[in-house]
């Protein structure tokens, strides 16, 4: 199966502006099917979830459909899908709930390649109970995060290891199954930030070995909220702070307040959109996997062109060269401030922003301080013309 990129692009109203969007790692553009699903849900007549009125049943149906959609997207039990305002908020909530069982001297492990949303919640939760945060470094040249580097930080006191599925700036994709085996051998839990991985590769949570897997629908064509999945039996053992009359069932006990039904409808529509990118299989899970494999192949080939072009521009420095990566380039141009590059590209209708993008530990570790670099990420709607325009803009700055 292959992607029909021209057809895909017609489903994205934002592309009519002529802008080349390389800012997908910060949030993708939205296809019309998702926007229509959200609008239809908001006007369909909803109430709080229940079983008496039609409005209550519609609300409940929206939630259950979204749980099933996420289950089909990442290969998990829908009963272990919980929704939150953002991945960051969900990670804070879960880290604090888990910390209730930690003791002074216990340890959590975090990595310098991660987004701060998968670092600070764990570090702060550890500090709150007298536990210790241990750090895993990555290779500055290749940006690889090795299993051995993680293993060196494990001990009998390790309670949680937090690691990215893919770096949101460098694209690094650690060997999660191998890391999971090491973490589980130490008797600890593995919390995977899959926000940047999920839009670019097929995901099977069980194969990855993740006890928790977090993602954000707005990175894969949906609305702005967060998702965490885990086995329902694991969630049953965790008791987050919640309101007294709120449901104590799993996963509802983790979902504070009324859920954003329109966003959940958008998530279901986004998964349906992904499933239809390059597959006509009978069941949605199979369609998702086939479409994501086709997407991964397309993005890898186009990203090769982008990397080759950037490497051929004098003064451009690319950071990291991991063996397995998402289509994400992090670069600087000698003699030019990152902001200057960003603004020059923006003036030409090419969106490739510059920042640390909350991967502040990675930015500092690379010697970039808090300012980071320019980031260019591909999406299914990115085409060769977009890449040519980006390369031309960078070359103009580098002259």
Write out the residue ranges for each language-model feature.
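Pyridoxal 5′-phosphate
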Residues: 1-399
